[in-house]
From Swiss-Prot:
Topological type in the membrane: Multi-pass membrane protein
The protein's assembly and partners: V-ATPase is a heteromultimeric enzyme composed of a peripheral catalytic V1 complex (components A to H) attached to an integral membrane V0 proton pore complex (components: a, c, c'', d and e).
Gene Ontology cellular-component terms listed: endoplasmic reticulum membrane; Golgi membrane; proton-transporting V-type ATPase, V0 domain; vacuole
InterPro entries in the cross-refs: ATPase_V0-cplx_e1/e2_su
Family: Belongs to the V-ATPase e1/e2 subunit family.
Protein name, per record: V-type proton ATPase subunit e2
The keyword Ion transport belongs to this UniProt entry's keyword annotation: yes
Keyword GTP-binding: no
Record organism: Arabidopsis thaliana (Mouse-ear cress)
Pfam families, per database record: ATP_synt_H
Physiological role: Subunit of the integral membrane V0 complex of vacuolar ATPase. V-ATPase is responsible for acidifying a variety of intracellular compartments in eukaryotic cells.
Taxonomy, superkingdom: Eukaryota
Keyword terms of this UniProt record: Endoplasmic reticulum, Golgi apparatus, Hydrogen ion transport, Ion transport, Membrane, Transmembrane, Transmembrane helix, Transport
Amino acid sequence: MAFVVTSLIFAVVGIIASICTRICFNKGPSTNLLHLTLVITATVCCWMMWAIVYIAQMNPLIVPILSEVE
């Protein structure tokens, strides 16, 4: 559940950033395309980094050793 919710948050942030980029940096069609490409690429890269770290924590390669403290 948390994976889907956070993925949706990344999607919403990407859409809002794309809209803000289109409004604030409106300098022509080729420049708009470059800015939107950079924003979308940055959003996808941040999401992929988060997803890889999140999924890696589900099945760790090294099992933690618990000490028996009484």
